[in-house]
């Protein structure tokens, strides 16, 4: 049976060949291996028809040009040689497109990423729509890879090496106007005339080569290139701690091509692509990609979600303001904020205004669009306008009686269909619902701070929550741009429960005399974005430690903080960055706030002279092993539904190193037996809190894993 082609050729009356990209049965266009022959066949037809004056590539999809290559192709490769051959095939197809003697133009609307941008780079000209959906980028580094179809060679020659490196090393995506300014596209036009404009560009002949700015010409020369790559190499090493081999290989491949020419660069690119595809880091990063993609299809319960037409938020504080913003500005849903004080409503409105206005200043948003989005948020000090709200998200103080009163009031002023979603971080949802008339409509929806930045939410049904309420809240979280995981209604839920022992162990290391900055450096070296002590400062020491007594009450001694360390810090009015006094001191210089460890912390904790006695590896081992042990307990107690959810929760919720794939994939990689052995060694050295849980001991004995065997390979 023949595969339905994703590429359709039509020659217009003006002799411009339009190749329409439309992957059959797929929402997104992605490049698959079998498309290679289809493209080659069309290129051959164009080449053989001497009357054709130009070619335009355009997508039939409503919101994407080509979103990248199909990652499953890489997962199916069983050796570096197979992956290298895949890259060479991509390079050859792009070379055939670029080799056409007539103008080839890419007409881009929507996502143009990875292999999609590499195809556009192989064209002689690029024109894109001015739509907000239009994004151009090479995000392969986020999968532990590099662009493998010529992108490492074509992009630096088109826009300059420094801008190209920034895009490839970070995966940063450019909007239409940014792409125009960078020289990545030749024109930006309204979507309605995109095809017409691309045809006109093709009829003009090949676009002239862009004059590179003087700075980029200098950086492309031998001396400038040497200085640039030396500087960027040091900078990326500091940021990645050597944990992401793709970063180093991108630098090597780009430099090789600039120094020795395109042919050498293409060969090195394909070889590096093959090597990187087989690294454990890429396999782990791809597993996160597959897991998060899988979660997008997960409804959370065996039920259809209810309607989502309007939402309400109780509380205009930091969390309430952030929740209102993502609901209205990301989710496109009208929001009504209720606060007992007008200043609370004003605070929440200002929160959204400031975020939107920042986008206007950065020219990412038009003032008219800012005003339209702000008009979707309203406020009141009473329940006016609440009657028909589908979901009411509660973001008031962590006080059980107060939250129960909120449930009662919402049931009084809202319809029977309204779902009450509590943004609690510590209180059992079953307790909040205990006095409800409609307990089936009560659920937990735990956001992380700052709401607009943190991608994860925990959805927490209690035993009596309706399946439809679960599905509706999961759908709402997705509308808000979040990745939701459904977790059980037990103390700490999942993320805070695995985070607390990690933080507590860092505090114990501090009490033992390890310097604040050395503890943080050790965990950053391990792969966390920030260390545990800095994390406490960022979240707020008062906020971040509220959960610990709750966990200690529920699970006992293993959650107790050492020697009242937190009490001593809080009594000295140290709340972290929010009052510029925590374990670090913060000085505002220019736009950025610089931090330095505060030596006054040590006497507060009874520490005479802090001194590093342990290696970075030993410090990291103690903190991380406490987290892994607790994660295994959560798995056994079915706090999470699967290893997939546990890995996504840890990576998206607390920054567990993505290149390790999450705590469960990491434990599977090193083996339950090895994890248990390390914990037993630490227990002998430091005490019973490190005793491996029964789950790990059982898995070690049976040789089993958290992830099913067939899912561990992706």
Swiss-Prot record:
It catalyses: a (3S)-3-hydroxyacyl-CoA = a (2E)-enoyl-CoA + H2O; a 4-saturated-(3S)-3-hydroxyacyl-CoA = a (3E)-enoyl-CoA + H2O; a (3S)-3-hydroxyacyl-CoA + NAD(+) = a 3-oxoacyl-CoA + NADH + H(+); (3S)-3-hydroxybutanoyl-CoA = (3R)-3-hydroxybutanoyl-CoA. The gene is fadJ. It comes from the Bacteria. Heterotetramer of two alpha chains (FadJ) and two beta chains (FadI). It is found in: Cytoplasm. Pathway: Lipid metabolism; fatty acid beta-oxidation. Its EC number is 4.2.1.17, 5.1.2.3, 1.1.1.35. Its main location: cytoplasm. In the N-terminal section; belongs to the enoyl-CoA hydratase/isomerase family. In the central section; belongs to the 3-hydroxyacyl-CoA dehydrogenase family. InterPro entries: 3-OHacyl-CoA_DH_CS, 3-OHacyl-CoA_DH_NAD-bd, 3HC_DH_C, 6-PGluconate_DH-like_C_sf, ClpP/crotonase-like_dom_sf, Enoyl-CoA_hydra/iso, FA_oxidation_alpha_subunit, FadJ. NCBIfam families: FadJ, PRK11154.1. Residues 306-714 are annotated as: 3-hydroxyacyl-CoA dehydrogenase. Keywords: Cytoplasm, Fatty acid metabolism, Isomerase, Lipid degradation, Lipid metabolism, Lyase, Multifunctional enzyme, NAD, Oxidoreductase. One of its GO terms (molecular function) is long-chain-3-hydroxyacyl-CoA dehydrogenase activity. Residues 1-190 are annotated as: Enoyl-CoA hydratase. One of its GO terms (cellular component) is cytoplasm. This is Fatty acid oxidation complex subunit alpha. Pfam families: 3HCDH, 3HCDH_N, ECH_1. The record marks 118, 140 as: Important for catalytic activity. Catalyzes the formation of a hydroxyacyl-CoA by addition of water on enoyl-CoA. Also exhibits 3-hydroxyacyl-CoA epimerase and 3-hydroxyacyl-CoA dehydrogenase activities. One of its GO terms (biological process) is fatty acid beta-oxidation. The keyword Cell inner membrane does not apply.
